[in-house]
């Protein structure tokens, strides 16, 4: 067999391998609808207050509106949930789960920021429901994107939330894969400088 024929055979095998690999690949489902949930949206709850005097709800309502606008430009539909009509946390989460289910959202994210008694606490973390592989994958994607953008911050990781832990009701109540975003500590002056909204 001539060298040129051997090369042709190798190229044929490579093409066949690529075709077989492509056929095995699962079709990637396009993201159609995102539920953007503003944390602390139940009656009488505004969340923690940052060192800049802005509470979680006010801060994240603005983030939600910006995110919705950005997604619209990407051709992705989203719905902002910023008013959970109940004082009770469990009833608010039940309502939210049903509302997101009716909208048939592909993913759900709830926007927060962390806070602690010490101003030295800092970093970002993304939470998912324990046992949810899709939720873990979603949280990992967000964490990776965050770490590439804000290299100066401490990476607190992707965290699984289980029964009895804060945030579990949201993560368990909503039908699609879900995560809670905690991108910084509002109680940290150093991080507030990075994340405060500027008009």
Task: Mark where each language-model region is.
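Active-site histidine-acidic residue metal-binding/catalytic motifs
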Residues: 2, 8-96
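Catalytic cores of processing enzymes, dominated by hydrolases/peptidases
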Residues: 10-13, 107, 130-185
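Short, glycine/charged-enriched secondary-structure capping and boundary segments
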Residues: 25-27, 49-51, 94-96, 121-126, ...
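Active-site-adjacent mobile loop/cap segments within catalytic or ligand-binding domains
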Residues: 32-35, 99, 103, 108-113, ...
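Solvent-exposed loop/turn segments at secondary-structure junctions
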Residues: 41-43, 84-88, 113-118, 132-134, ...
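A short, glycine/acidic-enriched catalytic loop
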Residues: 43-55, 114-146
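Extracytoplasmic/secreted envelope proteins and their assembly/folding machinery
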Residues: 61-64, 68, 93, 97, ...
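Long, well-ordered alpha-helical scaffolding segments within enzyme catalytic domains
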Residues: 62-72, 134-151, 193-199
